[in-house]
Amino acid sequence: MGRVQLFEISLSHGRVVYSPGEPLAGTVRVRLGAPLPFRAIRVTCIGSCGVSNKANDTAWVVEEGYFNSSLSLADKGSLPAGEHSFPFQFLLPATAPTSFEGPFGKIVHQVRAAIHTPRFSKDHKCSLVFYILSPLNLNSIPDIEQPNVASATKKFSYKLVKTGSVVLTASTDLRGYVVGQALQLHADVENQSGKDTSPVVASLLQKVSYKAKRWIHDVRTIAEVEGAGVKAWRRAQWHEQILVPALPQSALPGCSLIHIDYYLQVSLKAPEATVTLPVFIGNIAVNHAPVSPRPGLGLPPGAPPLVVPSAPPQEEAEAEAAAGGPHFLDPVFLSTKSHSQRQPLLATLSSVPGAPEPCPQDGSPASHPLHPPLCISTGATVPYFAEGSGGPVPTTSTLILPPEYSSWGYPYEAPPSYEQSCGGVEPSLTPES
């Protein structure tokens, strides 16, 4: 065995997650098989962010630092054989951003220790990553408890000479949710044509924006629900819910290089119609009772009123009457065909030394009474704490895989903003989106 048999960093009480402004205490342990002369023993606490133009590349194009503090644990001398412990303590800045790790960049907080030896001898180094969570209180966001509503109208041609339109309206009960909360979705589809529509699909999207030489947008589907299509000259309503899985919070206050947004996108493929609702994911739930919108009747401010179509052609009306079908104004309710959701990667916890147990899947209380449960974010993000004792409950449906980055240079176009969705403006890839 070598002269240095053990050189490691441990944090007090085995903690791995801290809040901004908290003290961080720990110990540097050294075990020597023989005396070791040294020039200095130092420990450093560092927080930084790096962004790259290529996926999974740590050659950062842009970097920014949040804190860098050093302590001298011992001056020049010699350590005798045996075990030695050096306690340390740092105060984390109140502005430190939440830890995050993605394919194009990450926010990393770590403690590094080094034994600087005399000239021509090898220095000894070790490090330990810890995580910072700056909780997002959804109640601090204006109008967060209000319903989220958007509408889109698509005009199209069919059978060469006939024209029609589809009015798609979608709404949610709130504008912000926490992990494990059910997002209540209401959709209203008015098929003002003689052609059946394709199935209606609702997707919860995550958009992570990285500021390198230009903005890079990484968009992936977190959960997806598919309903039935709407028959010709019919109006249909669809009520569904999406359980919010373990996800990193919206935005990353204190970091100017990485930003996280979430969207609920409701769409039809034929005819092509899409509405996009921005939603917030936080750590502290909305404490106001939500205002339930009237399904299919809510419209964003300034939007034109829904137009009731004229009666269908005479031959179609007669066929409808003979079949005993419902009137256009009598909405039918769509059934759900499939529901798929990405599952949390619980296996990644094993790579975090001393990490607490993950959230119980059955909603039972956490084993540790002093701390909220530790959850795992989907994708390549880091563990974080969520409010409450219940964890996300993954479905048994097909897993939705993230985009394959090896086959293309950059992620595809970001989803449109709320204003673009409501105003019919084509989305563009801009830093403000």
Curated annotation (Swiss-Prot):
Subcellular location: Cell membrane
Spans annotated as Disordered: 296-322, 349-372
Keywords: Cell membrane, Membrane, Ubl conjugation
GO cellular component terms given for this protein: cytoplasm; cytoplasmic vesicle; extracellular exosome; extracellular vesicle; plasma membrane
Annotated effect of mutating F88L: Loss of localization to the cell membrane and extracellular vesicles. Localizes to the cytoplasm
PTM (free text): Ubiquitinated. Ubiquitination by WWP2; promotes localization to extracellular microvesicles. Ubiquitinated by WWP1.
UniProt GO BP: extracellular transport; extracellular vesicle biogenesis; negative regulation of Notch signaling pathway; protein transport; protein ubiquitination; ubiquitin-dependent protein catabolic process
Protein's UniProt keywords contain rRNA-binding: no
Renumbered ranges of motif PPxY motif 1: 402-405
GO terms for MF: arrestin family protein binding; identical protein binding; ubiquitin protein ligase binding; ubiquitin-like ligase-substrate adaptor activity
Keyword ATP-binding in annotation: no
Extent of Pro residues compositional bias: 301-312
SMART domains named in the record: Arrestin_C (SM01017)
Positions occupied by motif PPxY motif 2: 415-418
Family matches, as Pfam families: Arrestin_C, Arrestin_N
UniProt remark on domains: The PPxY motifs mediate interaction with WW domain-containing ubiquitin-protein ligases.
Protein's UniProt name: Arrestin domain-containing protein 1
Protein source organism: Homo sapiens
Gene responsible for this protein: ARRDC1
